[in-house]
Swiss-Prot record:
The gene is menD. Gene3D superfamilies: 3.40.50.970, TPP-binding domain. The lineage of its organism: Bacteria, Pseudomonadati, Pseudomonadota, Gammaproteobacteria, Alteromonadales. Pathway: Quinol/quinone metabolism; 1,4-dihydroxy-2-naphthoate biosynthesis; 1,4-dihydroxy-2-naphthoate from chorismate: step 2/7; Quinol/quinone metabolism; menaquinone biosynthesis. It comes from Shewanella sp. (strain MR-4). Belongs to the TPP enzyme family. MenD subfamily. This is 2-succinyl-5-enolpyruvyl-6-hydroxy-3-cyclohexene-1-carboxylate synthase. It comes from the Bacteria. Pfam families: TPP_enzyme_C (PF02775), TPP_enzyme_M_2 (PF16582), TPP_enzyme_N (PF02776). CDD domains: TPP_PYR_MenD (cd07037), TPP_SHCHC_synthase (cd02009). It catalyses: isochorismate + 2-oxoglutarate + H(+) = 5-enolpyruvoyl-6-hydroxy-2-succinyl-cyclohex-3-ene-1-carboxylate + CO2. GO terms for biological process: menaquinone biosynthetic process. The keyword Transcription regulation does not apply. Homodimer. Catalyzes the thiamine diphosphate-dependent decarboxylation of 2-oxoglutarate and the subsequent addition of the resulting succinic semialdehyde-thiamine pyrophosphate anion to isochorismate to yield 2-succinyl-5-enolpyruvyl-6-hydroxy-3-cyclohexene-1-carboxylate (SEPHCHC).
């Protein structure tokens, strides 16, 4: 009788956790199979408020949860069993912490008496994520512990949280109830008697007010700030921050808007998108050096040239706008940081600058680069930059674009074309790893089923082959474009002492193709080596209701040689 009560109480705690998380805004739960997490798994299986996603590999599962949280702007729960299953979430948790994405890890664990004694699949799980998650350690379920304690613990940890939380859940055996019938949270249960009111509504047990403390400058401070030559820089911004408001701000003040690949504005016709290249254009750089005021929205800039410009310029006034308290400036410039939403800050009572339109010539230089890229990329030899520009120019309404790390995101930042219709853009640029990129894109695609394109390098895809299994489950378009240049060819751009060292220790050529991997997971596959075939396959893939793979075969040195040639032309402009 006692063991059956243990199984029932375990399950009841699991159900209380999942129900309260749903009330706290969780929409998705990502689950990997395992025995010690059974109370959570069975509770999730009966929870109708959550959409369930299952995958056998915890590393990919964590990144899928990351993508779901990015796309939904809501916390996502992850259920794993004990042991190294939890450790496999670490890369995704690091990325989520650095980019303020709320993931909630629910890890099944052995009870205290089975830790540190050689029991199977038992490791020290509390604080396993070190500095990258808020830690909550729940005791083993006990009838003497009031259910209200469990709910208030969850509420305090999760409400208004913008970063990962690790909730470690210890369970004693038996884990499996003898039967699953009826509702787990039965209002007739004596244990749940203190929660009768809670059971009758759909609100969290404890309701926390929003803890936002937004800051903004006075009208007088704004007037002084805009009195001079300035630039506005759009760094990493999420779609819900409504970055379009920065266009109106730029036009009102009369300062140029310089845009990063992650700003949602990189291709906007009213922005200066080619800033990375303009900073090596002699006339443009000389003009930009006249600026003495800068207004930066967001951080984590891609362009090293833009980062260097911010570091080297002698700024009279440097303002940065961030949604949370953060330090996002590797150059450590003296500045005033305002905690605010980008759109709200852009809609303050701004005045026209006394030096409005001081940098209008940048538009001419930006247009010159556009023409240069059309001639030498779009009409040039087939390669990675040409494919990326073709993707950026071919977008259905409401498309989502996930750009992989290493070379793809840099090529987009350097050479993306101007377009009046741009996709919602996502990246993983917190830790900037090349792992979990396909899984993240699958999570983004799965949330609302919008057509999604992933641009990913060959080594990144080799890192995440398991996630083809997640892609296979999608029922909306996900086009996986693999830029296969046979290794880590971003190292062609770095000052490795000689070619032999570059080849043997950095580039790691593999000679592999992805056709059989796609076939293993029953994914439609095409391999292309020219622009016409790519465009035909890409349009077809966008109409396919599921995931498909396009492998783009390019030579090892094509991208680096093209970048070098373009750099030379820009410098000679």
């Amino acid at each position: 009788m006692r063991t059956e009560n243990t199984a029932t109480l375990n399950l009841m705690w699991g159900a209380l956790i999942l129900e309260e998380l749903a009330r706290l805004g969780v929409q998705h739960v990502c689950m990997a199979p395992g025995s010690r997490s059974t109370p959570l798994t069975l509770a999730a299986a009966q929870q109708t408020k959550l959409k369930r996603h299952l995958h056998f590999d915890e590393r990919g599962l964590g990144f899928m949860a990351l993508g779901l949280a990015k796309a939904s702007c809501a916390p996502v729960a992850i259920i794993t069993t004990s042991g190294t299953a939890v450790a496999n979430l670490y890369p995704a948790i690091v990325e989520a912490w650095l980019t303020h994405v709320p993931l909630i890890v629910l890890s099944g664990d052995r009870p205290p008496e089975l830790l540190g004694c050689g029991a199977n699949q038992a490791i020290v799980q509390p604080a396993i994520f070190a500095n990258y998650a808020q830690q909550v350690n729940l005791p083993t379920p006990d009838a003497h512990i009031a259910p209200q304690m469990l709910l208030t613990t969850l509420d305090e940890a999760v409400a208004n949280q913008t970063r990962p939380v690790h909730i470690n859940c210890m369970y004693r055996e038996p884990l499996y109830p003898s039967e699953m019938s009826g509702t787990i949270l039965d209002s007739e249960s004596p244990y749940l008697r203190p929660l009768q009111t809670w059971l009758q509504h759909a609100r969290p047990y404890t309701q926390y007010g929003k803890s936002e403390q937004l800051s903004s400058p006075s009208d007088d401070a704004i007037m002084r700030f805009v009195h001079g030559k300035g630039v506005i820089i759009a760094g990493t911004l999420t779609p819900e921050q409504d970055p379009q408001q920065l266009i109106a701000l730029s036009q009102k003040i009369g300062w140029p808007l310089l845009t990063d690949a992650q700003s949602q504005l990189r291709q906007h016709p009213a922005a200066i998108g080619n800033i990375d290249q303009l900073l090596q254009h002699p006339k443009a750089r000389n003009l930009l050096q006249e600026a003495d005021r800068v207004l930066v929205f967001g951080g984590r800039l891609l362009s090293k040239r833009l980062i260097a410009y911010l570091a080297e310029q002698n700024w009279h006034s440097y303002w940065q706008v961030l949604p949370q308290q953060d330090r996002l400036d590797p150059s450590h410039n003296a500045k005033h940081i305002w905690h605010a939403n980008a759109a709200q800050f852009a809609q303050l009572n701004w005045y026209r600058s006394s030096s409005a339109n001081w940098a209008n010539t940048l538009v001419t230089y930006n247009d010159e680069l556009h023409s240069l890229f059309v001639r030498n990329i779009d009409q040039g030899e087939f390669g990675e930059a040409q494919v990326i520009r073709a993707i950026a120019n071919t977008r259905p309404l409401e498309q989502q674009l996930f750009i992989g790390n290493s070379l793809p995101v840099r090529l987009y930042d350097m050479y993306a074309p101007v377009s009046c219709c741009t996709a919602t853009t996502y990246t993983n640029r917190g830790a900037s790893g090349i792992d979990g990129l396909l899984a993240t894109a699958c999570g983004i695609a799965a949330h609302q089923g919008k057509p999604t394109s992933l641009i990913i390098g060959d080594l990144s895809q080799l890192h995440d082959l398991n996630s083809f299994a997640i892609a296979r489950s999608l029922t909306s378009p996900l086009v996986i474009i693999i830029l296969n240049n046979d290794g880590g060819n971003i190292f062609n751009l770095l000052p490795v002492p000689n070619e032999e060292l570059r080849s043997d220790y950095y580039r790691l050529s593999h000679g592999l193709e992805f056709g059989y991997a796609a076939a293993m997971f029953n994914l439609p596959y095409n391999q292309v080596d020219n622009l016409a075939d790519f465009q035909s396959c890409y349009h077809e893939a966008l109409d396919y209701q599921g995931a498909s793979v396009i492998e783009v075969s390019v030579s090892q040195h094509q991208a680096s040689e093209q970048i070098a040639a373009l750099n030379l032309w820009v410098k000679q402009s």
